[in-house]
Amino acid sequence: MKTALTIAGSDSSGGAGIQADIKTMTANGVYAMSAITALTAQNTTGVTGIFEATPEFLAQEIDAIFTDIYPDAVKIGMVSSAELIGVIAEKLRSYDAKHIVVAEVVTPNIPEAEILSGMKITDAAGMEAAAQRISEKYHCAVLCKGGHQINDADDLLWRNGCGKWFRGRRIDNPNTHGTGCTLSSAIASNLAKGYDLDASVE
């Protein structure tokens, strides 16, 4: 069985974070493992508290996984400090980790893509320009998610200087807590199973 590691925060409501990641990876037929960056008190209406893991403990979590069950893919979610990011980067480099969702591909929604690109996005052309800028700046593929009122939930994958649209249909449902975690975990699961990035996104 293929394996996938999620490095992210814990969601006490189970709708996002580590809990959503593990559910998604399991549903996609891979063995899920986790390294928790923070405990959060949250639900569908917001976050009321965060208790961050220490850098030393996060390093121990990652070591425990890589020295026993080497993951076929890694998904990185919520990381709340630069110090923890440094630990993750150092450990993944030292273990020569493969298929890292957030290093190989980032999955920003529209507000996140605006921050990463420094551009205002109001239409599909804006998504393309922002995705291109992010890809060039961070040297990775970008899956820009269009569900924030820009279109009918069409997503854009930008890689190697080219864009590919994945057409979606907006679902009329306010329960969207954790959808980004679920999508990135599904992509990581498919990468772990050997699919290329386009097929993993589709």
Q: What does each of the following model-derived ranges do?
A:
Residues 2-6, 22-101:
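Conserved N-terminal subdomain of the carbohydrate kinase-like
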Residues 7-13, 163-178:
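Short pre-catalytic strand/loop immediately N-terminal to key active-site residues, enriched for Gly-Thr
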Residues 10, 76-77, 145, 176:
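Glycine- and other small-residue-rich loops at beta-strand/loop junctions that grip anionic moieties
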Residues 19, 114-115, 173-197, 201:
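Short, small-residue alpha-helix embedded
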Residues 39-40, 78-80, 112, 147-150, ...:
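Glycine-rich beta-alpha junction loops
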Residues 46-52, 117-122, 172:
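Short glycine-enriched, charge-decorated loop/helix-capping segments at active-site entrances
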Residues 95, 103-163, 198:
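Conserved phosphate/ATP/ADP-binding segment of small-molecule kinases
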